[in-house]
């Protein structure tokens, strides 16, 4: 501890001291509030709302609001917030993370800042890890909020659209992180503002914040669906690879080297890559032109042909790198992948990027539709959009640096209401897994005989089943949880504190439910009270009997030493180990914990195995004897720190790459929202039209060029064939030989204005405006989807730029910016082309066209929170594939509005109006 810390206290101590002053203010208000009638106490809510509306600072309202919420809780829930819960509530209100031990009442604590911030009428989101906890907490606390005059909503995955809108319009909304995220993305895919469900991202309280913002930060949400059908294209492209030859290296006559025999493509089986040579490009372009797939004189690398080259490379890989009965088999008319490591069939799995469809075309079986990412976001970027973010958990301090670095969230460690009596014993390390499990069995048997409940934490379902088999063989009754059935697991966890209870749980199972020593009597009392067959007197008598029995069981467990925690191996994160330990010793209860390890455990084997084995050999440890020493524990902790640091780097790198897409996402979503809220887009269309035709004109009539350099016949042909415009600039020049290029451009723009005006006259301005808006939305959506796929392809190979002495991140940022600019140009061209070439005779036709455009062109939409393996491919982790996700939409004003003259958020240094703002 430094001298300054000794004198002034740590940052945490200073904050707690500051909060204690406010606690004294809140406590001073309690006697007066106790004297108020229920009606007078309820009247405080509208009074607070009125004061906020008149401009009073919400922070100044905190002591009174917290005091009112606590008094209401005493009357309604029969629970009074402890002083430490008031401190935790303050930390949450000020946008910090409150670390509170298990059983300290985080759910009740969250009611304080939720009530205070809901008074602003902008919505409060309480985020949990699963639907069961969201529903449980919402139903439990809605009685309190309702009594105080606030509404509560529950945002579950299975509810319908109207129910979602109702949930979000409530003052306080409970839901899961996945559902909030998916709703955000869905809201940015609607074609009518009335279809949105979210109303803005004002304030979020994230429960189990370490699990959501750290453990799940590497696994973005994805909305995907089946893209448009390219079956014919796959079949046609499939004819190209057999016409191309492989470039090979033949030995020189002296046998000392190799010379390249020219060919059309090269292949690298090690990296599973195939590349066209210069000659191969030309040959492929000629073949595709003959097939009618590539326009005469066009290049495969033109922006318009990005899909074509993608399909061509997929077909080449299918023909040259993927072989039947080695990489896949054809079974019942389907291509089934073979696992290259185990040789097993991977039914249901499909290669991505169109490769699977290319193999299906090669084998002449039915081609399944390609999946396409529709929208994506990471939790890191979603939660950072809230105006104010806070979180609570039992274990955050070990990750405090990451919370501060990534989310700008400070961690405040809240002291327990009663000091912990849990005894954390030294780890015991055995040479083999068999010895370790044998020692664990003895420990469990000893606890069982003494009536002490045991919770065994495992790192995987496989280990849970292994241990369950050992206990079954030893005839020890037990329960197994593996984090799948949330409602049932909460029930089992609630009774895991009964005498002789043995519960095996994977690390995450049962989080959010307290283990009460002696069992959870409240659950059993609820069942009795819900039994209509019993009279009130019988209910009261049975409930009293249950409570007396519980007291006896509780005392028995306390005398036996409280809940005993056994860890079967160390997790790579100290935080997860601390979560397991934290299940015991709640609210000052006694308890104990111990980890049993072996040199076969993954963490020890990789990081500390040799060192510990050397110590055991030197000490000549007999079979079955453990080593229990500080040096071993320190080695393990050091290993965990290394893994944590590596995982932090991975998440930080992921965020740096995703920030590029995030900046572009903000621009697209902001412009899309502006489109949705604009009834008349004719000015925007006019601006786009003039830009497109000016660019087209300058392609054939360059600025400051001589008349001899003009290609007016070529321009006339394009206007006639592509744009269906009966207008000849060659004839204009012939009639007026002295006309300038600027004047000709004006004539062209005037003609396009007249054509546009005629279309509006036929169907009416209002009807045509609706059609134009639908055209723009459809163009933005389809090109944004293709752009996401292009970013995905770019990111997958960007780490290879490092071999060329280039910075992959800078290259990714530069190329992503170029792709974004190309996408905006494609959107402009498509919108103008559709609006100018559409042939309409009546209003009915235009209404039908608008309806068709508003329908999604993507079917079978899927929502997924993709699994991510940190150890799968270290190189790719630093330039990871884009994983998409679904997330809720923010209100337009929830994203910072970019002014036309402000710097563009893409980082180019240009003004927004000259960069990504040019679409608008």
Swiss-Prot record:
GO biological process: intracellular protein transmembrane transport; protein import; protein targeting; protein transport by the Sec complex
One of the Pfam families matching this protein, by short name: SEC-C
Coiled coil: none
Cofactor section: Zn(2+)
Compartments, record wording: Cell inner membrane; Cytoplasm
Protein keywords: ATP-binding, Cell inner membrane, Cell membrane, Cytoplasm, Membrane, Metal-binding, Nucleotide-binding, Protein transport, Translocase, Translocation, Transport, Zinc
Record-listed E.C. numbers: 7.4.2.8
GO molecular function: ATP binding; metal ion binding; protein-exporting ATPase activity
NCBIfam families on file: PRK12904.1, secA
Subunit structure and binding partners: Monomer and homodimer. Part of the essential Sec protein translocation apparatus which comprises SecA, SecYEG and auxiliary proteins SecDF-YajC and YidC.
PANTHER family: CHLOROPLAST PROTEIN-TRANSPORTING ATPASE (PTHR30612:SF0), SECA INNER MEMBRANE COMPONENT OF SEC PROTEIN SECRETION SYSTEM (PTHR30612)
HAMAP family registered for this protein in UniProt: SecA
Family label: Belongs to the SecA family.
Name of the protein this chain belongs to: Protein translocase subunit SecA
Gene source species: Janthinobacterium sp. (strain Marseille) (Minibacterium massiliensis)
């Amino acid at each position: 501890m430094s001298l300054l810390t000794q004198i002034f206290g740590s940052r945490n101590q200073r904050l707690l001291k500051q909060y204690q002053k406010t606690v004294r203010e809140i406590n001073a208000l309690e006697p007066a509030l106790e004297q108020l009638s229920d009606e007078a106490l309820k009247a405080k809510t509208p009074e607070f709302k009125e004061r906020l509306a008149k401009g009073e600072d919400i922070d100044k309202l905190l002591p009174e609001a917290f005091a009112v919420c606590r008094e209401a809780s005493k009357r309604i829930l029969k629970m009074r917030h402890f002083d430490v819960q008031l401190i935790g509530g303050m930390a949450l209100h000020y946008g910090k993370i409150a670390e509170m031990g298990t059983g300290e009442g985080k759910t009740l604590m969250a009611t304080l800042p939720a009530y205070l911030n809901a008074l602003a009428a902008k919505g409060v989101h309480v985020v949990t890890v699963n639907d069961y906890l969201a529903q449980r907490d919402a139903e439990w606390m809605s009685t309190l909020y309702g009594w105080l005059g606030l509404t509560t909503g529950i945002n579950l995955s299975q509810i319908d659209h109207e129910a979602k809108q109702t949930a979000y319009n409530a003052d306080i909304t409970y839901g899961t992180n996945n559902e909030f995220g998916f709703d955000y993305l869905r809201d940015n895919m609607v074609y009518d503002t009335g279809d949105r469900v979210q109303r803005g991202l004002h304030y979020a309280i994230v429960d189990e914040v370490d699990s959501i913002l750290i453990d799940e930060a590497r696994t973005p949400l994805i909305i995907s669906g089946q893209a448009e059908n390219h079956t014919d294209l796959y079949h046609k492209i499939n004819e190209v690879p057999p016409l191309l030859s492989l470039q090979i290296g033949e030995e020189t006559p002296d046998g000392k080297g190799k010379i390249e025999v020219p060919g059309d493509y090269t292949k690298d089986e090690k990296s599973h890559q195939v590349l066209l040579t210069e000659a191969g490009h030309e040959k492929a372009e000629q073949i595709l032109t003959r097939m009618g797939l590539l326009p005469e004189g066009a290049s495969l690398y033109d922006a318009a042909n990005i899909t074509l080259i993608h399909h061509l490379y997929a077909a080449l890989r299918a023909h040259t790198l993927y072989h039947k009965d080695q990489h896949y088999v054809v079974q019942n008319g389907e291509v089934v992948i073979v696992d290259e490591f185990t040789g097993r069939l991977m039914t249901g799995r499909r290669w991505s990027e169109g490769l699977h469809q290319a193999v299906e075309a090669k084998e002449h079986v039915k081609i399944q539709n390609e999946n396409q990412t529709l929208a994506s976001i990471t939790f890191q970027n979603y939660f950072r959009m809230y105006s104010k973010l806070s979180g609570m958990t039992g274990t955050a301090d070990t990750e405090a640096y990451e919370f501060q670095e990534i989310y700008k969230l400070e961690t405040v460690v809240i002291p327990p209401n009663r000091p912990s009596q849990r005894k954390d014993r030294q780890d015991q390390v055995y040479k083999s897994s068999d010895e370790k499990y044998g020692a664990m069995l003895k420990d469990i048997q000893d606890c069982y005989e003494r009536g002490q409940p045991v919770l065994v934490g495992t790192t995987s379902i496989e280990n849970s089943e292994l241990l369950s088999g050992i206990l079954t063989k030893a005839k020890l009754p037990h329960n197994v949880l593996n984090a799948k059935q949330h409602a049932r697991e909460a029930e089992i966890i609630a009774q895991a504190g009964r005498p002789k209870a043995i519960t095996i749980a994977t690390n995450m199972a049962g989080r959010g439910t307290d283990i009460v020593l002696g069992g959870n009597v409240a659950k059993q009392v609820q069942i009795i009270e819900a039994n209509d067959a019993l009279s009130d007197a019988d209910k009261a008598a049975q409930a009293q009997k249950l409570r007396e029995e519980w007291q006896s069981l509780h005392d028995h467990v306390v005398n036996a030493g409280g809940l005993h925690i056994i860890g079967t191996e160390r997790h790579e994160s100290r935080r997860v180990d601390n979560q397991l330990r934290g299940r015991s010793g709640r609210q000052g209860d006694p308890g104990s914990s111990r980890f049993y390890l072996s040199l076969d455990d993954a963490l020890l084997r990789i990081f500390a195995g040799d060192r510990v084995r050397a110590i055991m050999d030197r000490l000549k440890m007999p079979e079955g004897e453990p080593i229990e020493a500080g040096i071993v524990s320190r080695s393990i902790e050091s290993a965990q720190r290394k893994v944590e640091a590596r995982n932090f780097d991975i998440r930080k790198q992921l965020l740096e790459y995703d920030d590029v897409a995030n900046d572009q996402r903000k621009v697209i979503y902001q412009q899309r929202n502006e489109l949705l809220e604009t009834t008349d887009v004719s000015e925007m269309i006019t601006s786009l039209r003039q830009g497109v035709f000016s660019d087209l004109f300058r392609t054939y009539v360059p600025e400051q060029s001589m008349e001899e350099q003009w290609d007016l016949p070529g321009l006339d042909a394009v206007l006639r064939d592509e744009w269906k415009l009966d207008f000849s600039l060659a004839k204009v020049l012939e009639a007026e030989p002295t006309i300038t290029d600027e004047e000709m451009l004006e004539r062209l723009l005037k003609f396009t204005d007249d054509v546009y005006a005629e279309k509006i006259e036929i169907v009416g301005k209002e009807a045509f405006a609706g059609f134009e808006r639908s055209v723009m939305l459809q163009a933005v959506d389809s090109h944004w989807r293709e752009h996401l796929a292009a970013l995905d392809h770019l990111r997958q190979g960007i780490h290879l730029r490092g071999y060329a002495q280039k910075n992959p991140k800078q290259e990714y940022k530069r190329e992503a910016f170029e792709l974004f600019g190309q996408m905006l140009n494609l959107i402009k061209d498509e919108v103008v082309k559709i609006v100018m070439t559409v042939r309409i005779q009546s209003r009915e036709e235009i209404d039908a066209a608008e309806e068709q455009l508003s329908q999604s062109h993507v079917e079978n939409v899927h929502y997924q929170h993709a699994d991510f393996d940190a150890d799968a491919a270290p190189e790719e982790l630093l330039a990871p594939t884009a994983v998409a996700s679904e997330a809720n939409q923010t209100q337009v004003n929830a994203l910072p509005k970019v002014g036309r003259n402000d710097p563009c958020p893409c980082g180019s240094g240009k003004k927004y109006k000259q960069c990504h703002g040019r679409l608008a």
